[in-house]
C-alpha cells in the first residue's frame, strides 16, 4: 500500500475519530496555480511531490508539517490554539531558510533544494535535493554533522518513514532503541494497520 492509499485510510480514520485530527490533518488539494508556481520556481521537483500537492495542500502527520500554499484550512472548534495548527507556507519557509542557512552552513554544497517539511518546532527540516533525495537537517544544533539522507525520494519518505516501517528512524538510530515512552495514538495506529510493526 502506497502513501495515496494510506491517505485514504487516514481520512476515514479522522472521519470516524475526530480527535485523531490532532495527529493527521489532510487538506483539500492545492490550487493548480500554486502547483504551477512550484514547478516554475523549482523545476527539479519530483512529480510525486506535485501529486502530493494535488492530493492535499500541505498536511500534518503526527509531529511533522508538510508544506503547502499556506492557504486557510479547516481546524476543529475544539482546538485550543488554532494558530499552531496551520501548515507552513512553502514559499515563506523557502525564503526564511535561504536567509538563515547561509549563516551556519555552506549552501553551495547543498545545491538546489526545496524545503518540503519540518517538525512542529522548526528544528528539523526535510529538504528535497535536486536528485530527488530527501535530506534531514538540524536547524537547532546548526551542525552539518547531523545531516542525513532519510529517503531516496519523496514517496519513500511518506511510504516508508512517516507512515511506514522505518518510522523509528525519526527518533532512534536503531529499532531496539524504541521504548513505550515514544508511543502515542499515531504509532499505535501505524501498528494496527500493519504499516509499522514493532
Task: Describe the role of every protein-language-model region.
Residues 1-121, 173, 190-198:
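A surface-exposed partner-binding patch
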Residues 137-168:
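Compact, glycine/acidic-enriched structural inserts
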Residues 3, 7, 83, 87-90, ...:
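Intrinsic-disorder-associated interaction segments
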Residues 41-44, 129-133:
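Generic structural signal for short, solvent-exposed loop/turn connectors between secondary structure elements
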Residues 123-128:
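Short, surface-exposed beta-strand/loop micro-motifs that present aromatic residues
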Residues 59, 122, 133, 163-164:
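Short loop/turn segments at secondary-structure transitions that flank enzyme active sites
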Residues 117-119, 130, 137-140:
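Structured loops at beta-to-helix junctions and adjacent beta-edge loops in soluble globular domains
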Residues 162-198:
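Acidic, proline/glycine-rich low-complexity IDRs
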